[in-house]
């Protein structure tokens, strides 16, 4: 009896493992997370942290921002206010979604892509399996086959790139010390973010969107349009 129960348990566990490990989709349990609150821990010295990939945080030059009384900056403020004045309910939901944190959301996007591509291609007539080719990623079988080794490397590449990009971002934030638009003009709303004294330029959301999207485009070349759409979504949510 005990042996039979053990066999039944083992078979059930195996079936469950196969079923969930090969799913193309994942459930989202974080849609209603509150906005990330880092006002009390700005890590203003983060620009001096040791990088992983970059030799220095200023390896890539970020141009000096325009003065807050310049015509271009005032035009940008007016554009922000115009955008904020006509927000739809869908846009407000997107703002709330990204307010939970770019690192979290891009990790979830990555999980979605890994799950989608975590299925081996269908076998050929002779019983052999075709191999995805990075040289021709748009032909069947689609590249990549995101098996555990590929997925682990992909997560590592993106995490390291995000880390270095944010260190560089913080380096220039403290260098230029540009106040956030809502501090320059009180009529600008701080939608989806907790007000703080963190310098606003360059935008950490724009940096996060840029580095995450470009890395994912290389790792999942058949998803370029989807990845670019998510990057633009994060950038607009910050406005």
Predicted ranges, named:
Residues 1-29:
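Bacterial Sec-dependent N-terminal signal peptides
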Residues 23-239:
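Acidic/polar surface patches and capping/hinge elements
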């Amino acid at each position: 009896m005990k042996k039979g129960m053990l066999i039944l348990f083992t078979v059930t566990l195996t079936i469950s493992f196969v079923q969930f490990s090969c799913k193309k989709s994942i459930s989202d349990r974080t849609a209603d997370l509150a906005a990330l609150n880092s006002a009390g821990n700005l890590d203003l010295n983060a620009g001096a942290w040791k990088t992983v990939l970059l030799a220095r945080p200023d390896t890539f030059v970020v141009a000096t921002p325009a003065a807050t009384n310049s015509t271009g900056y005032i035009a940008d403020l007016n554009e922000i206010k115009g955008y904020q004045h006509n927000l739809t309910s869908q846009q407000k939901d997107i703002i709330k979604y990204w307010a939970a944190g770019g690192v979290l959301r891009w990790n979830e996007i990555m999980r979605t892509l890994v799950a989608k591509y975590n299925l081996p291609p269908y076998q050929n007539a002779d019983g052999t399996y075709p191999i995805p080719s990075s040289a021709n990623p748009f032909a069947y079988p689609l590249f990549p086959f995101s098996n555990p080794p590929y997925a682990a490397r992909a997560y590592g590449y993106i995490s390291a790139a995000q880390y270095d990009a944010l260190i560089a971002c913080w380096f220039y934030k403290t260098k230029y010390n540009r106040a956030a638009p809502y501090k320059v003009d009180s009529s600008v709303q701080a939608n989806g973010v907790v007000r703080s004294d963190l310098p606003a330029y360059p935008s950490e959301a724009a940096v996060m969107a840029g580095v995450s999207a470009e890395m994912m485009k290389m790792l999942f070349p058949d998803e370029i349009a989807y990845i670019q759409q998510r990057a633009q979504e994060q950038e607009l949510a910050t406005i």
